[in-house]
């Protein structure tokens, strides 16, 4: 015979019960992905809500703790917009799209590497020293070329905006093998048609960078 007792739970008991339920629900997912590498794009509302920021960091730590190898690629649109406004950086729009001028690129670089990436690394590392923040500029991680943007059949110069053309995937894999979680800002050095650095840095969309890294892992 089974007895169902309706006993009020305090916050601690409820939390423990809910955690156990989540673990049971996640077991099939854990078995499926254990030992595999997963690329996760961090962006949207999760970047501006402190509660969602922490929940994301918790999820990444949980993935690592059950044997999944996460790679995080992050954007920073809301923070970049806020910093551009705060610093009164001149911004030009063409066909409704923001042009990444050298001045805008300086803000993008500062926000992605110095603010968003650092905050996420700190949240993850509050549990254990797992996360390592980096950008596409570090050790030739990513290489990019300027994007060709076509609107209504016309090519538009969007400034320092690029697409990934090469990924140093061996660097990423070596970090994963050491038990690290790469947290990657997608600002990337530009290369010419021969693969030589031009000395310029390009702003790369985080979704595009995450896709390029995932494809390089295949």
Protein language model features and the residues they cover:
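Nucleotide/pyrophosphate-binding catalytic subdomain
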Residues: 1-218
């Amino acid at each position: 015979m089974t007895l169902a007792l309706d006993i009020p739970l305090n916050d601690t008991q409820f939390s423990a019960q809910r955690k156990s339920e989540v673990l049971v629900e996640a077991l099939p997912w854990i078995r499926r992905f254990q030992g595999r590498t997963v690329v996760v794009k961090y962006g949207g509302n999760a970047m501006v809500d402190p509660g969602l920021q922490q929940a994301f960091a918790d999820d990444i730590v949980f993935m690592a703790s059950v044997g999944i190898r996460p790679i995080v690629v992050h954007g920073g649109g809301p923070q970049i917009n806020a910093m551009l406004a705060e610093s009164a950086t001149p911004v030009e729009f063409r066909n409704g799209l923001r042009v990444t001028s050298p001045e805008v690129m300086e803000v993008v670089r500062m926000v992605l590497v110095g603010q968003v990436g650092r905050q996420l690394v700190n949240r993850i590392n509050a549990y254990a020293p797992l996360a390592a923040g980096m950008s596409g500029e570090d050790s030739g991680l990513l290489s990019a070329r300027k994007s060709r943007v076509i609107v209504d059949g016309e090519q538009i110069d969007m400034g320092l905006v690029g697409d990934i053309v090469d990924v140093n995937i061996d660097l990423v894999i070596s970090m994963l093998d050491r038990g690290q979680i790469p947290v990657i800002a997608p600002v990337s050095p530009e290369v010419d048609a021969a693969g030589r650095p031009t000395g310029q840095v390009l702003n790369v969309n985080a979704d595009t960078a995450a896709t390029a890294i995932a494809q390089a892992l295949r």
